[in-house]
C-alpha cells in the first residue's frame, strides 16, 4: 500500500520516462516531414542539391540522392518517390512509437489508479468513526471515485502529451527559423501571446476546480443521506423539500462547472484568431518574391510557405492540445492533494503493541467522554465497572443515555476524554488495535448485510470458516431454521442491505456472523430488538452456555438483560444504577419503574 500518490508515481518511473521519450522521438519525425517535403520540391526545381541555398534543406536533398535513381528516365519522379518513401517510413515508425507510448500511458494510468484506489479504500475502512465523521461520507466517496479518476486521467495525459506538445511547439518554432528567419520571428511573436492566454485562464481555472470538487462532495453527501433515508422522507411526505434541496446543490455545481468551461472555451477562438493573423503575415512577408521573383524563386518560396504552414499547423495543434492536457493535470493536482490529505492523515486512534491474558476482560476507570472535547458536555461521565471473562454485562437506558457511546469506547472507535479503559489488564490505547478488533465482535442494531450470498457474508468475517462452522453459528443465533429452507442454503442470494430478509432474520444472521469468528467478547448492541421475546430468550440461553466468551448486551428491554451478571443503568451519560437484576430492583427506583412499566405492557 502506498502512503502518498507520489509513491505510486515512483513505482512507475520507467513508464513515466519511456512513454514521453517515445512520444518525443515520434514528434521529431513529424517535425522533419515538412522539411523533407520542401527538399523534394527544391530538388525538383534546381536538379542538383548544391544549388539549394538553405543549408538544412540542401542536406536533406543530398540524403534523398543517396538512394540513387529509381526511375532512370525521370530524376524528378525518382526524387519524389524516394522522398515519399522516406516520409512514409518516418510515418510508420512514428505510428508504431505512438501505439507503444499509448499502451504504456493507458497501462500506467490504470495501474496508478488501482494502487491509489486500493490504498485509499484500505485507509478509509481503517479510519476511526471519529475520523470518518471529520472527513464526511460525501468527501470520502468523492475522493475514492472522482479524485482517483482525475489522478488517473492526469497520468494518462502526462505520458501521452505533456512532453510532446511543448516539444512540437518549440521544435516547429526552431525549424521555422531554419526555413526563414522572418517566418521564425513571426512565429516567435505568437507563442508568448498564446502562453499569456494560457496562464491567465489556467490560473483562474485551477482555483475553481477546488470549489467544484467541494460541490461534488456536497452532492455525494446529500444523495447518500437521501437514499439511505428514503423511507423516512416518504413517511414524512417530505419529497418535495428534499428535491428542492438537492436541486439547489446540483445547480450550484452546474453553475461552477459552466463558469469554468466558459473560461476554458476562450482559448480556442483566441488561438484561431492569432493563427489566422500569422498566416496572413507569412503571405505578406513573401509577397514580393511571389509577385516579382523568377520562376525558380517563386517555387522555392512556395515550398517555404508550404513547410511554414505545416509548422504553423503543428504549433496550432500543439497549442490546442495543451489546454485540456494542462487542465487535466491541474485537476489531477487538486485531486492528488485531496487524496494525500486522507492517505497521510494521522488517525486519532493509534494501535498499541501490548497483549495480556488478565482474567478481568474489561474495566472502566473514571471514564468520561465528550464528542466535541468539551468538558461541559460529556456524553459519559465517571463510568466505573469491571467484567470478568465469561460473564455477561447488561446495559440499559433510554435514548441518548450513552449506551452506544460506551460500546464505541470498548471497540475503540473513539478514545476516552478522561479516565482509562483496561482490556485484559492493559490500557486499551496500548493494546494492539487489529488484535482488539479480532477478539471483540460487535453486532449493531442496524443489521448490515452485504450483496452476495449468505456464505459470502460469513466469509467476510472469517475467510476460513467451513460450511459446518457456519451452520453451527446459524443454529446458535436461531437462524438455521429459516436458512435451511432455502434450496440453495448458504448460497442463497443476499440483496443490497439484506433487503430480501425481514428485520428479525437480518438480526439473527448478523448475530450468527458475529459468532463465526469465535470472539472473546461478543457485543449485542440492541441487536435483538426486532425479535420476539421467545426467540430472544433462546439466543441468550445458547450464548450463556459459552463459558469462555464474555457477553455485553445493550437493550431497552429489561427481560433481555435480566440474567446478566452485572447490569448498568445509564441516564444522561451517568451510571445511576449498577448490580444484578435483583439488586437493582431493591436499590434503584428508576430501574424498578422501567421493569414494572414493561411488565404491565406484557
Language model features with spans:
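Helix-loop-helix
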Residues: 175-189, 259-338, 342-343
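ABC-type nucleotide-binding domain
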Residues: 358-602
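A structural preference for long, well-packed, hydrophobic secondary-structure segments
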Residues: 95, 116-125, 129, 138, ...
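Juxtamembrane helix-loop junctions of ABC transporter transmembrane domains
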Residues: 21-22, 26-45, 80-137, 141, ...
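An intracellular "coupling" helix at the cytosolic face of ABC transporter transmembrane type-1 domains
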Residues: 10-13, 126-130, 146-155, 159, ...
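Transmembrane helices of ABC transporter permease
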Residues: 11, 15-28, 157-211, 283-295, ...
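Membrane-integrated ABC transporters
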Residues: 1-33, 37, 42-84, 97, ...
Amino acid at each position: 500500500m502506498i502512503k502518498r500518490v507520489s509513491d505510486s508515481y515512483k513505482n512507475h518511473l520507467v513508464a513515466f520516462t519511456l512513454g514521453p521519450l517515445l512520444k518525443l522521438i515520434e514528434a521529431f519525425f513529424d517535425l522533419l516531414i515538412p522539411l523533407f517535403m520542401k527538399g523534394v520540391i527544391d530538388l525538383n526545381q534546381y536538379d542538383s542539391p548544391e544549388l539549394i541555398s538553405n543549408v538544412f534543406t540542401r542536406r536533406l536533398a543530398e540524403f534523398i540522392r543517396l538512394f540513387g535513381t529509381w526511375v532512370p528516365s525521370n530524376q524528378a519522379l525518382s526524387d519524389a518517390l524516394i522522398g515519399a518513401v522516406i516520409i512514409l517510413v518516418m510515418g510508420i515508425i512514428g505510428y508504431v512509437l505512438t501505439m507503444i507510448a499509448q499502451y504504456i500511458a493507458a497501462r500506467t494510468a490504470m495501474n496508478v489508479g488501482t494502487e491509489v484506489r486500493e490504498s485509499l479504500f484500505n485507509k478509509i475502512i481503517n479510519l476511526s468513526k471519529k475520523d470518518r465523521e471529520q472527513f464526511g461520507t460525501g468527501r470520502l466517496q468523492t475522493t475514492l471515485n472522482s479524485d482517483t479518476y482525475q489522478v488517473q486521467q492526469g497520468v494518462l495525459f502526462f505520458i501521452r502529451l505533456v512532453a510532446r506538445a511543448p516539444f512540437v511547439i518549440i521544435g516547429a518554432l526552431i525549424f521555422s527559423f531554419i526555413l526563414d528567419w522572418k517566418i521564425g520571428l513571426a512565429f516567435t511573436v505568437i507563442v508568448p501571446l498564446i502562453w499569456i492566454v494560457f496562464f491567465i485562464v489556467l490560473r483562474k481555472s485551477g482555483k475553481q476546480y477546488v470549489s467544484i470538487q467541494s460541490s461534488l462532495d456536497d452532492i455525494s453527501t446529500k444523495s447518500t443521506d437521501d437514499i439511505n433515508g428514503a423511507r423516512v422522507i416518504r413517511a414524512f411526505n417530505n419529497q418535495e423539500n428534499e428535491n428542492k434541496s438537492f436541486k439547489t446543490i446540483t445547480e450550484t455545481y452546474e453553475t461552477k462547472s459552466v463558469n469554468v468551461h466558459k473560461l476554458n472555451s476562450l482559448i480556442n477562438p483566441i488561438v484561431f484568431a492569432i493563427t489566422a493573423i500569422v498566416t496572413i503575415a507569412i503571405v505578406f512577408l513573401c509577397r514580393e518574391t511571389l509577385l516579382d521573383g523568377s520562376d525558380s524563386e517563386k517555387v522555392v518560396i512556395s515550398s517555404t510557405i508550404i513547410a511554414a504552414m505545416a509548422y504553423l499547423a503543428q504549433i496550432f495543434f500543439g497549442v490546442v492540445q495543451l489546454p485540456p492536457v494542462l487542465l487535466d493535470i491541474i485537476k489531477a493536482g487538486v485531486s492528488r492533494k485531496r487524496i494525500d490529505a486522507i492517505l497521510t492523515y494521522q488517525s486519532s486512534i493509534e494501535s498499541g503493541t501490548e497483549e495480556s491474558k488478565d482474567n478481568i476482560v474489561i474495566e472502566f476507570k473514571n471514564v468520561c467522554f465528550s464528542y466535541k472535547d468539551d468538558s461541559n458536555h460529556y456524553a459519559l461521565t465517571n463510568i466505573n465497572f469491571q467484567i470478568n471473562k465469561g460473564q455477561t454485562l447488561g446495559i440499559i437506558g433510554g435514548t441518548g443515555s450513552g449506551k452506544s457511546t460506551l460500546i464505541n469506547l470498548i471497540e475503540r472507535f473513539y478514545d476516552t476524554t478522561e479516565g482509562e479503559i483496561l482490556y485484559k489488564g492493559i490500557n486499551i490505547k496500548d493494546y494492539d488495535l487489529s488484535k482488539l478488533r479480532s477478539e471483540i465482535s460487535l453486532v449493531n442494531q442496524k443489521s448490515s448485510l452485504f450483496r452476495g450470498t449468505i456464505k459470502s457474508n460469513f466469509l467476510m468475517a472469517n475467510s476460513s470458516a467451513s460450511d459446518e462452522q457456519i451452520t453451527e453459528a446459524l443454529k446458535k443465533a436461531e437462524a438455521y431454521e429459516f436458512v435451511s429452507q432455502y434450496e440453495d442454503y448458504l448460497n442463497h442470494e443476499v440483496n443490497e442491505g439484506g433487503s430480501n430478509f425481514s428485520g428479525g432474520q437480518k438480526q439473527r444472521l448478523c448475530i450468527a456472523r458475529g459468532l463465526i469468528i469465535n470472539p472473546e467478547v461478543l457485543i449485542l448492541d440492541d441487536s435483538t430488538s426486532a425479535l420476539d421475546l421467545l426467540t430472544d430468550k433462546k439466543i441468550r440461553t445458547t450464548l450463556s452456555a459459552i463459558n469462555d466468551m464474555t457477553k455485553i448486551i445493550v437493550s431497552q428491554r429489561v427481560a433481555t438483560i435480566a440474567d446478566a451478571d452485572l447490569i448498568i443503568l445509564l441516564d444522561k451519560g451517568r451510571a445511576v444504577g449498577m448490580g444484578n437484576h435483583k439488586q437493582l430492583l431493591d436499590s434503584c427506583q428508576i430501574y424498578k419503574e422501567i421493569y414494572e412499566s414493561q411488565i404491565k405492557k406484557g
